[in-house]
Structures are given as C-alpha cells and as structure tokens.
Amino acid sequence: MLFPTEFDVIVVGGGHAGTEAALASARMGAKTLLLTHNIETLGQMSCNPSIGGIGKGHLVKEVDALGGAMAAATDESGIQFRILNSSKGPAVRATRAQADRILYKAAIRHRLENQPNLWLFQQAVDDLMVEGDRVVGAVTQIGIRFRARAVVLTAGTFLDGKIHVGLNNYTGGRAGDPAAVSLSSRLKELKLPQGRLKTGTPPRIDGRSIDFSQLTEQPGDLDPVPVFSFLGRAEQHPQQLPCWVTHTNERTHDIIRGGLDRSPMYTGVIEGVGPRYCPSIEDKIHRFASKESHQIFLEPEGLTTNEFYPNGISTSLPFDVQLELVHSMRGLENAHILRPGYAIEYDYFDPRALKASLETKAINGLFFAGQINGTTGYEEAAAQGLLAGLNAGRYVQEKDAWCPRRDQAYLGVLVDDLVTRGVAEPYRMFTSRAEYRLSLREDNADMRLTEIGRELGLVDDTRWDAFSRKRDAVSRETERLKSTWVTPKTLPPEEATALLGKAIDHEYSLAELLRRPGISYDGVCGLKGGECGPAEPLADDPVLLEQIKEQVEIGIKYQGYIERQASEIERNDANENTRLPDGIDYREVRGLSFEVSQKLNEFRPETIGQASRISGVTPAAISLLMVHLKRRGLGRRNGTAEAATEQGDGAVPTQQ
C-alpha cells in the first residue's frame, strides 16, 4: 500500500547517524520520517559504552555546536568524564565519557519523540523507490510504500551483515538483530560502487565475577568535572563510576596464537578489512609480536547492570578460546562471560561516489551517512548524519547544500577525506588528519559553527542566546586585556615577582603578560589586589564563565600561531573552492596524462581542492586544469555574497 502521508525526507536507520539526520532535517522544518527496524534500539550503542576521544570528541563538540543531540545526551547519561591530553596543547585536548547505555538511548529517544516535524515508524526497509535518476521513497518489508523527495540511508553494519564467532557464522546486522539483505541487493542493482568491511566487539563480562582487588582503578576527572555540550552542566550527570585496568600476558598471547587456526580472520573466512586503529586482539598479538602485554580497560555498561565491556580484546575467536583468554588475565580468573565477542562483515559503498553534501552523484536526493560510507565510530556517524540530514532538508527546499571546509571543521576534514580519497579500511578521525588543528579545537567549536548553524536553521533560541553572550564577552574581555596596562610604578615588585618571577622593567599590557608561559588568566586578573580583573563579572553562569576565560586565554596565548595559520588558510584558499563543471571531459584538457584524466573522469571531483587531493593528481596537473578553465571561462568560485549571506559566513555552497 501507499502510505497516505507524503514526507519531505525519509531517514532509514535509527543509529547515531540516523538519529542526528532525522533531528537535523526536522529542525530545518522538513517533514521527516525516521524508519527503523526496532524503535527500542534507537540510539543503541552497539559496541563500546563511550563517546569521544582524540579527534572524536572534536566531532561531538561540532555536532553540538550545530544543535545536534549526541553531546547533550552524553551529559545526561555519562557515568565517567575525562579530558584526554590535558597536559598538552589545546589543539589535541579531547573529552571522553563513559555512558550508561540505557540512559543514553532514553535521552536520544526523548529528543526524537518530542521533535516537531518528525515522525517515527517501526519497519525494516527492503527497497528504495527510484524514478529515473532520482529517489522518490522507500518500501518496507511488508510492502508499505512511503514517498519522499529525499532519502537518507544510514544502514550501519546491517547491509548483508554476517556475524562470525570462530568458524561459525550467520546473517545479522549486529547480535540479536537481522541483517538488511534485501536492501543490500537493491543497492547493488543501482550499480553504486561497493565493497566489504569488517568490525568487531569483545565479549561482555559479569562484574560480579571480577576480582577488582587485583585491578587498577581509573577514576574520572573530578576538579572540574568535564561536560560535553556547550550547554551542559555537571549537575546533569548521573552517579559517576570508575573504570578498571588489567593486562594481557604471555599466557594470554599463547592462548590466542593457539586459536588462530580457528580464527575466521586468519583462515580466510572473513574477507572484509577491519579497522586499523581498533584492531582485534588477534591482530594486536600478530602485528606487535614483541610486545609482552596489552592494557585492557574494564568499562561499566551502566548503573543498573553488572555488565562490563573489556576494551581492548575485540575478537572473533571461537568461544572456548575467548573464555580461556579472559580467564588468563589478572582479576578475571573466574570471570563469567555474558555475551561472546564476534566480528561482523558488512557492505559499504565507495564514498568517492558521493558529493561533498553526502548526496550520491548517481541518484538525486539519495544521501548516505555513517558506516555505509566506510567510517567507524559513533562520533563519525553522528557528524555525517547531521550533515546528510541538513543537506537533505536543503535539497527539498531547493537550496544549495552546505559543505564545511577542511579549515572550518573536523566534519569538513572527515567528509573531504571520504569523498576525495575514499577508504581502504574503516575510517576513524584523529586530530592528526587535520592540517589546521590549532584552529579546530574542541573549545572553539561553537565559535566556528554555531553562527552558521543559526543561519541554516539548526540552532534554537536557547543555544543562540548562550552563544551570543559568550562570543560578546570573549571579544570584550580580550580587548580589555589588550588595552589595560601596568608599569613598574603601578605594579609592586613583590607582586610582579610572585607571578612573573621578577619585577617588570617597562610598561606591559595584561595581554602581553598573559602571553608568557605558565601565566594564567586568573593570575593576571589577580594583580594589584584584583584591580586588573574585569569591573563586572563576565557571566553569572559559572560554566559559561569558565568557557569565556578559556577562550580568552587560548586566543591571547596562541594569537601568533593562530594568525599564521589563518594566513596559510587564506593562501591555500586561492583555488580551493573553484568549481569544476559537471560535464567536463578531462581527456580534452591539454597536457593531462592518461592516468590523471582517467582518475578525474572516474571520481568527478566538484572543486579544484578536491581534485588536488586525489592520489596521483600532481600540482602540475592542477595548473593545467586551471589554465583550461580560464581559457574556456568555465571555472567559478564557490561562496558568492548571496550564498554567504544566506548560509553564514564561511559556508561553501555546492550546486545540487
């Protein structure tokens, strides 16, 4: 039957990509339908019970700055919070939280059920409705046809998923859930380039059978307790719990080696490539054969369960080997396994077949987000989901897509890497992937993106008000520190010595003093008995106050580095956003090698910047392209004044 209501956007899948996509589309005013095979698993944390980490936490902050749900849901469900790399520079500091799985799902579902313009429906999708070169809807397993002008597909590991435990395997999207076999077959009919990837998860352990007296406790940060959302408060956090640390040993490694002849990875049963940066314990023992021990973190799954997640022993070994290797580790000698670990193989589609908006090049109105694009991780999925949902909404509103640049957001780095370079293995985000990471910090994600999010219709009044107060206070306080001076006469030598190590010998602005190593904002403001502080409080809210102080201090201390990076961005931007015509035949570009013209015709980059990042495309080839465009008057720059006004300063529109 044809469902009587026609929607603007259909989102298929209710994981981290799908939930953010549905919320973003609905926030923009698009009539949105979220189709999921099981409403009870909306926002399910299928693997580890944690959010954030190096690079990943940056993505979560960016999703939050654009009005997304992941950070706020983590604040409501997080049972341990830590700042990683806290002793290092601000560019690589990252927030990580352990989350209660049940509370996290509840927080996400609450937002979905209370979001205007969003409908939920429980049915697996078996088919897409395609007319010519555009998608027009989706068909469920019982034949209900839902019509829409755009579809966002966020199928996770469900596309033709196959679960492996030892040499046994069966179809499944994850443990306890069916695979999407019919939908996978339908997508293959559409001739979209695809492949197989693999990921895995460890066995789960009953905490009542763990001897914690033999383990090392790892508490969260308490002074201060971190929060994830820019609107978050530590008071929102539920009860906090520690994690625990144990280690593998030589006996563990011998047990694993003895089981490799029954490992699906090492017997060729699994063909998909696994994640390099989240390897199975089999991979670790094989790749790092000289290493005598590996650290294993025992992470609590929640406040109302005894289940623990042993981070570091993801495996697809036979269950008897899993049991033996767990029992070989200190504190786990009598551990009871609640669920076996497993590996899962699934279909993904080459992201080079996508536009930077995450719309497929072959089928208008069809967007992909999450693991279907070859990524791994909740955070990468959520970021893609938000972008795909946003651009699906803009597509039905007949507006240009918004595609963040590499110098603008980690989301921009993520998408640009995917659509220009593709993936040979599951892609995860690291700060090292961003060439402008000093400008792309966690602490300034809102400064970079919230104003754009407001222009796009993603940011509500509450967030906008808090952001505006913070932005204005940072600007005022920075200028005050630059224009407030102390002299040898006005600053007593003993005060100067206590703060700076010696008396000052000439006039300094407070900003110049703050720029010195080891000097803090509070230290500078405390000079002259506190007279160097602001005349009025920067904010009534203590959390907002700390954010303002952090922004001011980082902005002043790293001003020179940030300005140099801004100059570099400006230089590199000269041709970055010059568009390449849709119909160009690169064989006609004089001087291009056969290899380069073949790659350009195959991958169809949208801009000169994307073309330059395709493997094998040389700077000389880019110069020839620029000459060709100028000779024929084909090239045009993205980012007209009209587009910038409509989408927020710094947005890069791309033609649908």
UniProtKB/Swiss-Prot annotation:
Keyword Coiled coil on entry: no
Oligomeric and partner information: Homodimer. Heterotetramer of two MnmE and two MnmG subunits.
Organism: Burkholderia lata (strain ATCC 17760 / DSM 23089 / LMG 22485 / NCIMB 9086 / R18194 / 383)
Residues that hold NAD(+) according to the record: 274-288
Family: Belongs to the MnmG family.
Protein name: tRNA uridine 5-carboxymethylaminomethyl modification enzyme MnmG
Keywords of this entry: Cytoplasm, FAD, Flavoprotein, NAD, tRNA processing
SUPFAM superfamilies on file: FAD/NAD(P)-binding domain (SSF51905)
Cofactor: FAD
NCBIfam families referenced in this protein's UniProt entry, alphabetically: mnmG_gidA
GO-annotated molecular function: flavin adenine dinucleotide binding
GO biological process, one term: tRNA wobble uridine modification
